[in-house]
């Protein structure tokens, strides 16, 4: 078994603190979304919806705002209220990543609720980290990102199963 020193655990904890606004944005969109689809029902030339009914205007906005609120909360804890901007960027990236994931699923012929392993779990994570990097030119160390991606896969599975059992989701993935 590989042992991680306390410094490694600290870096992983910092990474989790960093990505928390994206996690909460993704969860908030699921819990409080619904309503009008972000794509307004539009179809592309292939006859398939642009995004589908699962990506909604309300969910997108709630997700972005939730990310900003979590960022603000983190900022208040560490004495830097500008962290709200980080939370906004991470929330926006998470919602954009989720929308891109839905776009890809529609293009390959998968309907809403159809499983797309890894894509379903990491689209918001990749979107958040990518947008943060594009805006600020920074991301956690590579090994921390890999650790967070693995943690995200596990947490996503767990929260989806819980959501399914609580009848908040139609499918457990």
Curated annotation (Swiss-Prot):
GO terms for molecular function: CDP-2,3-bis-(O-geranylgeranyl)-sn-glycerol synthase activity. GO terms for cellular component: plasma membrane. It catalyses: 2,3-bis-O-(geranylgeranyl)-sn-glycerol 1-phosphate + CTP + H(+) = CDP-2,3-bis-O-(geranylgeranyl)-sn-glycerol + diphosphate. Pathway: Membrane lipid metabolism; glycerophospholipid metabolism. The keyword Transmembrane applies. It is an enzyme of class 2 (transferase). Its EC number is 2.7.7.67. Keywords: Cell membrane, Lipid biosynthesis, Lipid metabolism, Magnesium, Membrane, Phospholipid biosynthesis, Phospholipid metabolism, Transferase, Transmembrane, Transmembrane helix. Catalyzes the formation of CDP-2,3-bis-(O-geranylgeranyl)-sn-glycerol (CDP-archaeol) from 2,3-bis-(O-geranylgeranyl)-sn-glycerol 1-phosphate (DGGGP) and CTP. This reaction is the third ether-bond-formation step in the biosynthesis of archaeal membrane lipids. Belongs to the CDP-archaeol synthase family. PANTHER family: CDP-ARCHAEOL SYNTHASE. This is CDP-archaeol synthase. It comes from Methanopyrus kandleri (strain AV19 / DSM 6324 / JCM 9639 / NBRC 100938).
């Amino acid at each position: 078994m590989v042992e991680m020193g306390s410094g490694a655990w600290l870096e992983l904890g910092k990474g989790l603190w960093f990505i928390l606004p994206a996690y909460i944005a993704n969860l908030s969109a699921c819990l409080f979304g619904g309503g009008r689809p972000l794509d307004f029902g539009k179809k592309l030339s292939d006859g398939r919806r642009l995004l589908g009914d699962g990506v909604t205007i309300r969910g997108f906005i709630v997700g972005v705002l939730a990310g900003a609120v979590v960022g603000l909360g983190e900022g208040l804890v560490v004495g830097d209220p500008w962290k709200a901007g980080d939370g906004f960027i991470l929330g926006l990236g998470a919602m954009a990543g989720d929308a891109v994931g839905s776009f890809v699923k529609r293009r390959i012929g998968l309907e809403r609720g159809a499983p797309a392993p890894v894509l379903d779990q990491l689209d918001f994570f990749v979107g958040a980290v990518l947008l943060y990097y594009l805006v600020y030119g920074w991301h956690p160390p590579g090994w921390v990102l890999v650790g967070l991606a693995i943690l995200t896969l596990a947490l996503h599975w767990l929260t989806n199963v819980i959501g399914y059992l609580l009848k908040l989701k139609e499918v457990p993935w």
